[in-house]
């Protein structure tokens, strides 16, 4: 398992352009783009994962399964019955008139999936036009806690090492490394 961290300390690259995180990942020929973040939803009390609705939820489902098997809690939500607990599809963007578009909201998923997720063809994302025909990476957004829920932050702080170890185990198992 090779891991490449796409930013340096005090470096905050965005999701667009030649120096953005997706561009850095494409240049390294990454197979997986793992984005970590925190939710701002005060109702979220435990970690959850987002995947692209244009791809499968296989890795996230594997992580959910192993976390449950190891006594870890995920936010009890899922997009559909083919997904495990704590696994959601990203939402679609809407136009100014409320029409649902074919583009996802999270650039960490949309801009890393290449042509499968419409990378480089929406709004500011034209800065990633070089990747609109790329095969892309498997994108996974792992929301480790809610910044608006102290119970969620406490749970993460108490279980961060176990969550990280199970996430790595899931990646190794899913990709058969």
Where are these regions (language model features)?
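Active-site-proximal helix/loop segments of hydrolytic enzymes
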Residues: 1-177
């Amino acid at each position: 398992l090779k891991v490449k961290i796409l930013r340096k300390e005090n470096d905050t690259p965005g999701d667009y352009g030649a120096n953005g995180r997706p561009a850095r990942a494409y240049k390294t020929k990454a197979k997986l783009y793992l984005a970590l973040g925190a939710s701002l939803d005060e109702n979220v009390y435990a970690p959850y994962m987002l995947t692209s609705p244009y791809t499968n939820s296989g890795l996230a489902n594997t992580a959910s399964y192993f976390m449950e098997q190891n006594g870890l809690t995920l936010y009890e939500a899922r997009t559909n019955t083919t997904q495990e607990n704590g696994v959601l599809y990203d939402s679609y963007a809407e136009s100014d008139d409320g029409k649902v578009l074919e583009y996802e909201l999270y650039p960490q998923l949309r801009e890393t999936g290449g042509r499968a997720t419409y990378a480089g063809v929406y709004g500011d994302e034209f800065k990633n036009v070089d990747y609109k025909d790329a095969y892309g990476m498997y994108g996974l957004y792992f929301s480790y806690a809610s910044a608006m829920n102290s119970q969620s932050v406490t749970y993460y702080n108490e279980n961060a090492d176990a969550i990280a170890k199970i996430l790595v185990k899931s990646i190794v198992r899913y990709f058969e490394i």
